[in-house]
Amino acid sequence: MIPPLKTGVTLPQPNWPGIETERLILRQWRASDVAPNTMMLSDPGTARYITADGKPITEPMNGWRNSAIMAGHWVLKGIGMFVVEEKATGKFTGRVGPFFPPSWPGFEVGWGIAKEFRGKGYAFEAARASINWSFATFELDKIIHCIDRENAPSQAVARRLGATIEGETVLLGHAADIWVTHRDRWAG
């Protein structure tokens, strides 16, 4: 169950324009996102930390299924990971945002940026916007980030966000540290 909404807040509707940052647009999923999401997940280095089995997604049907899970999270929960679009080009750069499926250890803001867009600070920029939105929208004291112990780039993003390791979990058979961003320490 998602946390209670703050008083007077409503969840995004299908025509919601999204969140804009200096360089990015965070928005809901479209059919046109399936191919670039599949391309992102075909990279072994990306798939290792994002796909359920840690293997690259190379079959179009599996890419569609993964995108349907992301889009379906919005339908079933009213929230979900945003598609991250580069404002200057309109290109799909990844997915970042709230993720809270059944049996998850808490309300997460996660991130995954396509290989060709890494090193530009997009994960941090989009995650910061997602955390700001989540704290503004929900009655939350903390937001978690489940990060594989070998995923140094994601750990660096979490540190930059001010998150700290406060536990561990096993998700889909993979050990992960639970990084936590606390509302009362969040600088936004």
Where are these regions (language model features)?
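Acyl-donor (CoA/ACP) binding surface of acyl/acetyltransferases
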Residues: 1-49, 79-188
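Conserved GNAT-fold acetyl-CoA-binding loop/helix
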Residues: 45-69
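A short helix-loop-beta-strand connector motif used in the catalytic cores of GNAT acetyltransferases and
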Residues: 68-83
